[in-house]
Amino acid sequence: MFGMKRLLTALLAAALLFSLAACGAAAADTAKEKPNTKPVVVTTLFPAYDFARTIAGERCEVSLLVPPGTEAHSFEPTPRDLLRIADCDLLVANGGESEEWLETMLDGIDGEVPVLYMLACVDPLEEEEKEGMQDLHEEEHEDEIEYDEHVWTSPRNAMAICRAICDELCTIDADGAAYYRQNCDGYCAELEGLDAAFREIVAQGRLGCLIFADRFPVRYFVEEYGLDYYAAFPGCADDAEPSARTVAFLIDRVREEKVPAVFTIEYSNEKMADVICEDTGCGKLLFHSCHTLSAGDLARGETYLSLMWANTESVREALG
């Protein structure tokens, strides 16, 4: 499955590089006509966008490459997107398998684009397949390591990423260093408060286990707070129908652990969760991974902090 995805990614990248070369001259002319005095920061995912815009404030132009509501794992960049990357002063990306297209793009761009990878800011964790999970990798090589890319789901990881973004901004705009560091310190203080709230909730909870009737993009979160978990699929696996065995396993766990509610993640069809809830009488809760927001979420002013604070209440309820 992943071999075919990589082939398609490479073909797409080659086509886009050709388009980039063709559009280069026109882009240069446009840049000359409309000079920009602010540093330009391009981000690939919402967490990076939210962190960067908070720290950069009014001193930088910060934009999000993956449009709101778009599934980041299936994002296909356009020639215009590539020009944005080529012309930016800093690119904040996630890294990892889902952004392999980006490496090919960067290799084909004349000059060097400063890139900060969120995965490089923390100690990455491998995806794991726990008991009861649907096996989606039967045809893959056993020695192929896949890292969980959702590093920001740990607030402490978010702090490390923010400090790294701040350092990069200070490098490309030394005159604004004091401003960036002040913004970063203030934001990290808010993240400290979020982290403290999660720790208190976990310490006071009756249970020490979360059950996801869905994909599982929050391994960094459960590792941070010492929680056990069960889930239907590892990481942000491709859409797949759960087996009867997987559903039955999760139903048994809900009953044995006396779990008050199971989790779904954003943009899930929730069918499996509905089956489990109907069979066991448990509730259903949302854990927003903050990976992708809808246009409506952005219009309402949702942020990483607002979504994660909403998650605190869900975790409190799920732990009993």
Language-model features, listed with the residues they occupy:
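Extracytoplasmic metal-acquisition and chelation regions
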Residues: 23-320
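Bacterial N-terminal signal peptides that target proteins for export
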Residues: 1-11
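Bacterial N-terminal signal peptides
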Residues: 11-19
